[in-house]
Amino acid sequence: MEHEYQRAVTRVCVQTALLLLQHGAESTVVVQMAQRLGVALGVESVECALTANAVVLTTLSDNHCITTARKNTDKGINMQMVTDVQRIVIAVEHHLYELEIAQRKLDQLKPLKYNRWLVVFMIGLSCAAFAHLSSGDWIICGITIFMLKLLYDMLFAAIPAVGFALVFNVPPKALKYCAILAALGHVTRTLLLHINMPIVFATFFATCVIGFLGVHLSHRYLAHPKAFTVAAIIPMIPGVHAYKAMISMVQIHHFGFSDALFEQMISSFINTSFILGAIVFGLALPGLLFYRQKPVV
């Protein structure tokens, strides 16, 4: 391999890693995408090291190494950029793009930004939906009373999912799937709670539904699963329990210690921790089953 070509491959690989890291991709995804792109372009191997503010990448070809480093500046979560970069890497792997085309495509990428007023409106509407999901009255929520329980449960889970998907700059075509996954996940948890399943297990199974559907959609639309799943799990975040724990701590500090306040604080904190744990494991399970390269044991 010619030295100049390897240098060009190194530059495009580090640019790929930098774009992914800047816009909120996981470190594992960043490293894997850079390695896959380099191998697809003909180098023997790619080594990538990430720090909080830099990317260091080395390509190896014909016993010749080239190392480069780039400073990382966080540009906020933008799943549109992550998805577009992944599609470019996949296109190179399928021999649809050569080095020059891949470089040009990466240079042409622009972060998706939704209209700020639309984001503000959807976040406000999302907060109203959270109020309803937390047993707020109809005046606060400002919605119709004629919907069936499960239908408006799905609706009020879908609204905040879309609102936060806009915050995360999810690709426009993925917005409807974020809403659908949020609706299906939350209504699954509601049904499981209705049959007296503990909220931790209900949340875990509901998050698994979102996770598996997210993996399916990622294969179908060549996007990262988190483009569909991260916003969808937002309605199940235990904000009320966390708020109660915080308020109890403030009251203990202000009014002094009491058994009732301490019990409420510990109970709310434990509920928050276990529900968050259920969400994390439920969302990680599909990845462990479908993407892991080595056996767990």
Swiss-Prot record:
It is found in: Cell inner membrane. It comes from the Bacteria. Signal peptide: none annotated. It is a multi-pass membrane protein. Disulfide bonds: none annotated. Keywords: Cell inner membrane, Cell membrane, Membrane, Transmembrane, Transmembrane helix. Its main location: membrane. The chain crosses the membrane at residues 114-136, 150-170, 197-217, 227-247, 269-289. GO terms for molecular function: transmembrane transporter activity. One of its GO terms (biological process) is succinate transport. GO terms for cellular component: plasma membrane. It holds the Pfam family ThrE_2. PANTHER family: SUCCINATE TRANSPORTER SUBUNIT YJJB-RELATED, UPF0442 PROTEIN YJJB-RELATED. Belongs to the ThrE exporter (TC 2.A.79) family. This is Uncharacterized protein HI_0108.
